[in-house]
Design a protein with these regions (language model features):
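Surface-exposed, charge/polar-rich loops and edge strands
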Residues: 1-41, 45-178
């Protein structure tokens, strides 16, 4: 089965540095098939026979700890499931508007998106929109006023940030088709 692993918080402002070519080699050497990476932000595609995405995430997390000596949360989703999820996007999400920034928030096991949403609270009216589907949340916000948006302020906050990983609509569309 084809999977996508999303690594949380790597290669940001010189922190949690992981070389994508080195990670690709390491995962291949540890038995993952047809490993590919996209961008430097921790997007990894691979094949494996394991049906449990949470077990795969734990295997990848352990490999990263062993090779790179970093404790990195990992979210894994079957590629077909990501495609299905993207097909369920609300009409306001993923537009071509340069004024709006569209993201998808994934809850990293054992967390649920409902718990994350409860901790963050209601989105700021007029500034952002949120719609939960499965264990993810479609989230869009006004690029000019993002700093005033409730979800923007809280997604990186202690107690919430480590529960999630976030990707843009464009990144997810690309890796869904790779």
């Amino acid at each position: 089965m084809r999977y996508i692993a999303l690594l949380r918080g790597i290669n940001i402002s010189g922190k949690n540095k992981i070389s994508m070519p080195e990670l690709k080699i390491a995962l291949g050497e540890k038995g993952f098939g047809d490993v590919k990476t996209y961008l430097n932000s921790g997007n990894v595609l691979f094949s494996d026979d394991e049906p449990d995405a949470v077990k795969l995430a734990e295997r990848i997390r352990t490999i990263i700890l062993e090779i790179f000596h970093l404790e990195i949360p990992v979210f894994v989703i079957p590629q077909d499931e990501l495609k299905f999820l993207l097909s369920k996007a609300p009409s306001w999400w993923g537009s071509d508007s340069k004024d709006i920034y569209d993201n998808l928030i994934f809850a990293i096991a054992p967390n649920s998106i409902e718990t994350v949403a409860e901790k963050i609270g209601e989105p700021s009216a007029e500034l952002e929109k949120v719609q939960i589907y499965g264990n993810a949340a479609f989230w869009s916000f006004d690029r000019k006023l993002y700093a005033k948006a409730n979800w923007w302020k809280k997604t990186a906050a202690p107690g919430i940030g480590e529960m999630i990983t976030i990707r843009t609509a464009n990144t997810l569309r690309k890796i869904a088709e790779m």
